[in-house]
Structure formats: C-alpha cells, structure tokens
Amino acid sequence: MQTTSIKTASGMYINYFFLGMVNIILASNMSSLTKQWNTDPTGISYVIAAIGFGKLLTYGISGVLSDKIGRKPLVVASAGIMAVFLVGIPLSPSYELAFVFALLAGVANSAMDAGTYPALTELFPSASGSANVLVKAFMSVGAALLPLLITFLADHSMFYGFAFYLPAAVYLLNIIYLSTLSFPKKHKKPTNSGQQESPVFLSEPVFQKEGTALIIIGFTSTALFTVSQIWLPSYAQKAAGLAESASVQLLSYYSIGSLASVLLLAVLLNRWVKPVFITLLYPIITLCTLAVMLTVHIPVVLDITAFFLGFSTAGVFQITITLMTELFWKRKGTVTGIVATASSLASILLPIATGLIAKAGGIAHIFIFDFGIAVIGTAAAAFLYYRYKKLTGAQA
C-alpha cells in the first residue's frame, strides 16, 4: 500500500514540478513574447491574469467533480490541458489567441489542485501537511530550473519555445503514467495536519469564522508570490540598476528560498510544528523582508531579500488547504475548490492591479501595495491561530 501511495504521489508531484515552470514561464519570456504579440510588459501581465481567470471560472466545478467522480480523472485531464497550453503559446500569432491558451492553463490548474490536494490528504492521512507542502517543493525546483533552461537556449541562439515544449512533452508522458495508477477512495476522515492523532475539536469549526480566515489567507498567500514572480526582476532593474539577465536571476534565488522553506516544513510539520503556526509566522517574515527591500537597494541585499521572499511565501497556500480539509473534512474537494477560487481571484486581480500601477510609473509602489497585502494576511492568520487554539484546547 505504501509503495502504491508513493507511486501515485510521484505522478502528481511531476505535474507540479512543471507547474512551477508554468507559473513563471510567461514573465520569464517577456521580451520574446512582447515582440511576438506586439504588446508591452503590462500586456503580458494581462495574459498572466487570464490564467487566474481560467482558474476562477472552473475551481468551483472542479471541486464538486473531485468529490463526485474522484480525484484521478481531474489529475489526468489537467496534465493534458496543460500540455495544450504549453504547445499553444509559442505558436500563437496573436495576443488574443494567447489569451485563450492562458485560460486553458487556468482550467488545468484548477483541475490539478482540486484533484491533487484531497488525494494527497487521503494517501497520507497521518502526514497530510507534509505531503501537501511537498507540492510547493516540486514547484520551487521547477521554477528554479526554468531560468537556467531559458539562459541555455538564449546562449545557443535556440528558439525560446523549446522551454515550453519540453514540459509539454513530459506532461503527455505523465498522462500515460498516471493512467496506470490507483487513487484513494474519497471521504476518509483525515488525521490532524501532519500529526499522528485524529483531530478532536472542543466545538464544531465554524465556516464563517475559520473558513473565512482561511479563504483570506488563500487569497493573500497567492497574491504575495504572484507579485514577486512577475515584478521582482523589474523592481531590481529600476531600484538597483541591475541588467536584465542579472535581475532574472533573482527568480532563481526566490525559488531556492522556496525550496529551502518547503523542505524544512516537510520535516517540521510532521514532528514539531503545527501548520497553523506557519500561517502566522510566514506573513510576518514577508512583512520584514518587504520593509528591507523597499528601503535598501543594494544588489546583494536584493539577492538576500529575494531568497527570503521565496522562503516566506512558500507552502502557505498548501498549508491553508491542509487546514481547510482538516477542519471541514466532509467536503474536502469542495472546500479545496473554495480556497483555490480565492487564490485564482488573486491570480487575476494582482497582475491587473500591479500592471496598472506599473503603467502609472511606480514599480516601487507595487511592493508597497504588496506590503499592505501582507498586513491583511497576517491579521487573518492571527485570527485563525486564536480560533484554532480555542477549537483544540491545545498550544498551537
């Protein structure tokens, strides 16, 4: 059984390894895409927003389908749809067609989330927090490797589209692999996030309280890493005068920080630290990091802050879903879809809002705006932490 669970999880983790690339692939190829579609960086940010719009349109139905027909069909379908996006973008002759492919990427992402997170919770009920956080680990590795692949293609004067075609090919192969695997049955009651005991609540969790706080955290956690992934290189160019090639490397430092964080969480969540504490600690770290980044514009400091931004935004969304499925376990797929809908709203609104701010000539103001989002996330996490302690009667 354990071997079967690991094989099934590995197929889902492969999906997320390449989703890590997908999340930054448009921003990382901004120069090539602006020329191909005759647009500007703000236009690319709107295509990125279309991915979030695709997620928003389908997260609700994806969550319901996950509970109705099972996790496997959604996970398999997501890989196929994502491959279509990756092949379609470099071949798109127009901005409008690219927008359609971006919508498909959002559909794929929603299906992937609604199928994968509940499945991991059911595969590893005594370590669901660690299993879900490892999703972010694989995404971070993929995101860290993509800039290296793009640099390799540029150095060898190769078509930028190969950075899209390689993950597309692996997604297609993964469909075959996933189709041979067994997925868990639905509606098993989970154990406490990353703990060995079943959750024992002193009172029934209230969706209007704990659920609302988790939805807010789902929004802010996605907003924080969305802003960094799109605008961190541009901010470094404007604030510290870094060259374009050097500024893109900040995304690698960001991804390394993310990877370090989730590997640490994968160990700590199963032994010493409860997920609810991380949802409070990490936004506080983000606040401190943004404060330094906004006031100190030395290149080496930006490298360090990029690392800590990646570190403090990594895994929070995954932990949020783990907590939501723990507190409201009877509808794991549905509540996953609700949190993911909040996340998709952030994926839509943040590229649009920050694109407008950038167009007004204030990239520094983007990260001041980001600081405000971190404040909201911290407040929601503090409320959740307080409520969780009351529900469990334990030191969270």
Curated annotation (Swiss-Prot):
It is found in: Cell membrane. GO terms for molecular function: transmembrane transporter activity. One of its GO terms (cellular component) is plasma membrane. CDD domains: MFS_YdiM_like. The chain crosses the membrane at residues 8-28, 44-64, 73-93, 97-117, 133-153, 158-178, 213-233, 250-270, 276-296, 304-324, 338-358, 363-383. Pfam families: MFS_1 (PF07690). It is a multi-pass membrane protein. Keywords: Cell membrane, Membrane, Transmembrane, Transmembrane helix, Transport. Belongs to the major facilitator superfamily. This is Uncharacterized MFS-type transporter YfkL. It comes from Bacillus subtilis (strain 168). The gene is yfkL.
